[in-house]
Every structure is written in structure tokens, then in C-alpha cells.
């Protein structure tokens, strides 16, 4: 059973670095540090000293906004393109780590598409990991395990992952290089220049294009760059508010900008992403 095999070799104890083994409803290391699985199925591997607040990561409001918005299919063009990329670079019986997985929509979709790989999704938000585990359970996807941890302290064995994915999540090159196998694949998704242009134009007097990312982070070689774009029509204010709260602009916008969003009853906007595929040097 792929799932059990990989699980045993990949997650490590955040306290002592020893491999974790499943023990009933918990994970345990040789030094007897024990981590219980929550009822929904995720395991919390975030140590108290790695938290910067009592409830780090995205809060319930943000998690629910994303879950509701993505659940309506607005970003399906990206979800499908991402899953296709994972399939294209898949390794039979290999391990994929989704670092900063949020509520697991992309992780679960890829795990369904590539049943021959074992997926680990991790996020610093307990609310997000809980939503992700519930989603996997509801959809009967068993080749995935979610955990709570920071991308800056991944509780994952060095050189154990065939693939690492990072979608709109914090970047930690050192950790990503550490956990990937030699020549492992990194799949990164970022917003392209004109992503949500019409939403920005509705909110700001002088909207600006997104800054393109540097194309080759240290330690990686770019293999492929895939643009993914489409237009979406949001025909109600709830969806517009959910989309707005998923963006970094939500926290940087004046009260006037928030009022403009509240006044929109419909919005047609471009969505534009780049899928960047790298090989570890």
C-alpha cells in the first residue's frame, strides 16, 4: 500500500527529527513524542514556539471565503491545469508535498487525478488543514494526509519528496530544496500580471499590474512556464466579496475601496496565472 509506505518514511517528529509512525489515531516517534490526529483526519505538527500568534495562518473568514468561492468553480481552469501538470511530472509510488495547501482544493484535485502518488498537504492554519482533511474524506480520497506546520519548518524528512507544489503560498527555498529528492520537481503557481485586473479597476483609481516573479530561484532550473487565463463573471456581491477577501488587496484597501466592493452587484474580470515548473539542481 503506497499510502502507508510513504507516510512512514516522510513525516518526521518536529521535536527530535525522528521518523513518525502511525499508531492508531496518532503519530509517534521512537522517542515517544505523540501527535494525535484530529477527528477530521489531519495531524498537528506545529510546535508552540513556531507560532507567532495564538491562531497562526488564515482565519475562519478567509478559509470559508476561499472554500465557497473555489467550490463554485470559478478557478476550475487553474485547478485542472495544475492537476494535469502534477500528472505529467508524476513518479509512480512517489511523494508530493503541497506546502501551504490552504483548504486543500488543489491538493485533493491532484490526488484524485494521480492516484499512484501519495500526497501530503500542510498549512500553518489549523482551520485550513481541518477543511482540507474534511474535503478529502467527503470525496473519498485516501492517498493524501494533511498536517499543520510552517513552510519554514517542514516536519518532513530531507530528500524524501519527488515533487513539491506551492500555490500562492510563502516561499522558503532552503526548506524546499532540503525536502526534495535530487532532480525533484517543484511546481509553483503565481498570479500573472493582469490577474483580477477589472476587480482592481473597480476598487482603485489607478490600478497597477502584478509584478512578475524572478524566473529562476536559487537551486532550481526552470523547465516549463505555462500561462493559464480566462474570464469569469461574478453575478452576486457575496462571490465578489469572497474573491476580494482572498486577495492581498483586502488588507491594503481604504474604507472607500471596501465600500466600492460592497456596491458591486456583478463583475466580469480576467483571471491569469502562471504555472512554473522547476527541477532541483
What residue ranges belong to the model's regions?
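Conserved Class I S-adenosyl-L-methionine
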Residues: 8, 228-281
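Class I SAM-dependent methyltransferase Rossmann-like catalytic core
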Residues: 58-77
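N-terminal auxiliary segments of SAM/dcSAM-dependent transferases
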Residues: 2-55
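Conserved SAM-binding loop of SAM-dependent methyltransferases across substrates and taxa
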Residues: 103-115
Amino acid at each position: 500500500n503506497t499510502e502507508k509506505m510513504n507516510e512512514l518514511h516522510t513525516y518526521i517528529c518536529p521535536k527530535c527529527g525522528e521518523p513518525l509512525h502511525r499508531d492508531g489515531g496518532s503519530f509517534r516517534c521512537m522517542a515517544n513524542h505523540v501527535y494525535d490526529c484530529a477527528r477530521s483526519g489531519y495531524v498537528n505538527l506545529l510546535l508552540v514556539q513556531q507560532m507567532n500568534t495564538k491562531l497562526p495562518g488564515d482565519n475562519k473568514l478567509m478559509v470559508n471565503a476561499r472554500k465557497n468561492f473555489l467550490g463554485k468553480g470559478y478557478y476550475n481552469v487553474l485547478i485542472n491545469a495544475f492537476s494535469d501538470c502534477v500528472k505529467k511530472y508524476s513518479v509512480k509510488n512517489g511523494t508530493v508535498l503541497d506546502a501551504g495547501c490552504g483548504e486543500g482544493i488543489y491538493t485533493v484535485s491532484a490526488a484524485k487525478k494521480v492516484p499512484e502518488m501519495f500526497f501530503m498537504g500542510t498549512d500553518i492554519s489549523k482551520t485550513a488543514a481541518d477543511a482540507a482533511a474534511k474535503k478529502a474524506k467527503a470525496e473519498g480520497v485516501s492517498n493524501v494526509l494533511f498536517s499543520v506546520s510552517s513552510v519554514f519548518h517542514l516536519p518532513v524528512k530531507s530528500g524524501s519528496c519527488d515533487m513539491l507544489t506551492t500555490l500562492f503560498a510563502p516561499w522558503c527555498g532552503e526548506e524546499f530544496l532540503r525536502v526534495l529528492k535530487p532532480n525533484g520537481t517543484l511546481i509553483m503557481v503565481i498570479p500573472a500580471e493582469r490577474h483580477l485586473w477589472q476587480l482592481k479597476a473597480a476598487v482603485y483609481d489607478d490600478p497597477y499590474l502584478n509584478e512578475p516573479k524572478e524566473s529562476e530561484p536559487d537551486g532550481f532550473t526552470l523547465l516549463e512556464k505555462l500561462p493559464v487565463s480566462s474570464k469569469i463573471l461574478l453575478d452576486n456581491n457575496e462571490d465578489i466579496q469572497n474573491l476580494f477577501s482572498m486577495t492581498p488587496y483586502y488588507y491594503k484597501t481604504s474604507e472607500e475601496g471596501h465600500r466600492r466592493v460592497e456596491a458591486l452587484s456583478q463583475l466580469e474580470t480576467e483571471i491569469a496565472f502562471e504555472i512554473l515548473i522547476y527541477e532541483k539542481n
